[in-house]
Regions:
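Short, Lys/Arg-rich, polar N-terminal cytosolic tail immediately upstream
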Residues: 2, 6-32
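A structural signal for multi-pass alpha-helical bundles of membrane permease subunits
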Residues: 30-329
Length: 329
């Protein structure tokens, strides 16, 4: 009679494998359930984007037509690329395009530097009550409308009764006609934009900073590292993903601008159009003159250029993120 040998090692290994399979099955079911939950959570947002962004995009066909309101979109004659030719031949186009890109570049740099600086200061603060107070102060301007912000700017820079001119007059100086001085408005608009948006940017960066271990910064302090060294060597490398995310969002709109902001802050003063006219304000006036095909061509060009810019930054971000991971690990 053949003896059956009992190998405890084989039994133990088989048990481990069975447990691993069971655990893997549980994890897979959990992942599937989580994916379904995330899908239904994001579904309303996806529907809103499709309804309000993708479906209306079909009206860009106007850019290729000689659109007449009385004849409608379908009844209007095809114009091919004529509207785009007129756009590029417009004598103001290059100047306005440059204004738009420069403004958005300045917005991106100033807002991100201010937001990252504020978030880092909050992260380094120890007192929770002070953190909460300053976060509220930073975010509050974001909820102020540009109409009200425009009134604040007008109260400061009004040619006749502005606070700044009153202070200048008090010290014996001559009043400055701010709304007839184009050179100062890029600075005013950039500072106003930063005041309104840097707080929200700081919230995003502050959330990213929460993933950093305080032990690392404390160890660096014990080794004698200064604040700048801690920021550049510990904090910044770990929030690069958030920096790139904000960069992609901002770069995608580099050829667009906030129409309400420019009109409310400048009050559409003709004397400063040279430095405050951007694509949105210029071509919105084209819509007011019923030249809708021309304005649609400008809008389509803005969207296409923004998509290309965002794609370029996304590729750059992916490459830099992979390089950073290789350097760390």
């Amino acid at each position: 009679m053949r003896e059956h040998r009992f190998n405890i090692d084989n039994v133990f290994l088989r048990g481990i494998k069975d447990m691993a399979k069971a655990e893997h099955g549980k994890n897979k079911r959990k992942k599937d359930t989580s994916a379904i939950k995330l899908f239904f959570m994001s579904l309303p947002a996806v529907i809103l984007i499709i309804v309000f962004n993708y479906i209306p995009a079909g009206e860009y066909i106007i850019a290729f037509k000689d659109y007449k309101i009385g004849r409608g979109i379908i009844g209007s004659d095809w114009a091919g690329l004529e509207n785009f030719r007129l756009l590029f031949e417009n004598i103001h186009f290059n100047k306005i395009l440059l204004n738009t890109v420069l403004y958005n570049s300045a917005f991106f740099v100033v807002v991100n530097v201010a937001g990252l600086g504020a978030a880092t200061l909050l992260f380094r603060l120890k007192n929770l009550h002070i953190k909460v107070f300053f976060r509220a102060v930073l975010v509050l301007p974001y909820f102020i409308s540009w109409v009200f912000a425009g009134e604040i700017v007008y109260a400061l820079f009004s040619n006749d009764s502005g606070i700044i001119n009153q202070v200048i007059g008090f010290f014996g100086g001559e009043k400055v006609l701010w709304y007839n001085t184009p050179a100062v408005w890029p600075v005013i608009i950039t500072l106003a934009f930063a005041w309104k948006n840097a707080g929200v940017c700081s919230v995003v960066y502050y959330a990213a900073l929460q993933g950093i271990d305080h032990g690392m910064t404390e160890a660096a302090e014990l080794d004698g590292a200064g604040e700048f060294r801690i920021f550049s060597d510990i904090i910044l490398p770990q929030i690069l993903l958030a920096v790139f995310l904000i960069a992609v969002i901002n770069i995608s709109g580099i050829f667009k601008s906030d129409y309400e902001m420019f009109t409310q802050l400048t009050r559409e003063s003709g004397g400063i159009f040279g430095t405050t006219d951007v694509l949105d304000t210029y071509f919105r006036r084209g819509m007011q003159t019923t030249d809708l095909s021309f304005s649609a061509a400008a809008g389509l060009l803005q969207s296409a250029a923004g998509c290309l810019a965002a794609f370029f930054v996304l590729c750059l971000a992916r490459r830099e993120n992979n390089r950073f991971r290789r350097d760390i690990f």
